[in-house]
């Protein structure tokens, strides 16, 4: 899960988190934006609770890396026959001076409409555009090409992040079994949680 609470106050004993949380994803984006010197952010937030949580992670990362959110707007539009992304997005994003547009839309309800449609041509990051993810099909190091090709041959599609998480879980258990020289659950569990 991406929920930060599951790694903090609600963290359970005996749980191993394999995929990045919202805070980790936001920090990764902030670090890259800092490297590119894109320090002024325009934040667009959706209406769902998940969007609010991702926006909070983005704000935390911006503060942590000394980046500035110069504008924040809530997206309340829906696209129907009378309204189009071509018309709404440029108007929504004009009037602000920013380096990058940050979208918080975890369910993908509107974020895809922002790429190449902003008033000023700016990169889009966050939950759409440039995203922080544990896995991407273009990853080529550490045997990733072979893993990707084998997965595609068996599943008939490219590996996604959730698939990679499942692979990591199986790989961790297998590695613990080999290194502990045991197939007993308590021994494997103890190995996984040892320092």
Q: Could you say what each language-model-derived stretch is?
A:
Residues 1-195:
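Extracytosolic ligand-binding ectodomains
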